[in-house]
Amino acid sequence: GHGGASNYVRL
C-alpha cells in the first residue's frame, strides 16, 4: 500500500 514505514507490511 501507500504510506511507507506505516504500512510497509502491505508490500
Swiss-Prot record:
The keyword Secreted is assigned to this record: yes
Keyword annotations: Amidation, Neuropeptide, Secreted
Q: Mostly located where?
A: secreted
Where is the protein found, in the record's own terms? Secreted
Which residues does this entry mark as bearing Leucine amide? Answer: 11
Q: Which GO terms describe its biological process?
A: neuropeptide signaling pathway
Which superkingdom?
A: Eukaryota
Q: Which GO terms describe its cellular component?
A: extracellular region
Q: Family assignment?
A: Belongs to the FARP (FMRF amide related peptide) family.
So what does this one do?
FMRFamides and FMRFamide-like peptides are neuropeptides.
Q: Protein name, please? A: Extended FMRFamide-9
